[in-house]
Amino acid sequence: CYCMGDGLEEVKKASSVSKNIVVSPAALMAAKYLEKTFGTPYEIYYPLVEELLPELDYTGKKVLIVHQQVIADSIRRELLERGAKTVQTAGWFMMKKELLADGDMSLRDEDDYIELVQNGDFDIIFADGCMERMTPEFKGRFINTRHFAVSGKLIGK
């Protein structure tokens, strides 16, 4: 296993792993390279997705997820399995076309996010907690889903 915070010694072993798990869009190019060069297969998903989901009834809910693309898509797949009616993802950063689903949106600025929330009729929003105050009129459930590139925080409040 090698990931953020590991030293070069761990990264040097990348060609010997049995499978890569791509947890961010930024890692996709490296995974493709390792597959092409060494035959190492890869999967794209966030393995800890259930830790991000509070125990709620998602049945019939319309959900917006604003996060990096792999985490957002992993949350989407889990919510759809739990009965969500629709799940749309959006993000400000790298959006790989091979990870896009119909309705996914690349945000240019805060106004894009505000407009999406105002016009989206969402029941639930998953996004970094610092974004909650951008849409004080949102009456649904806001779930703080930490996004380091947005708030600069890895964990905590």
What are these regions, as identified by a protein language model?
Residues 1-157:
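An N-terminal assembly and electron-transfer interface module characteristic of large anaerobic redox
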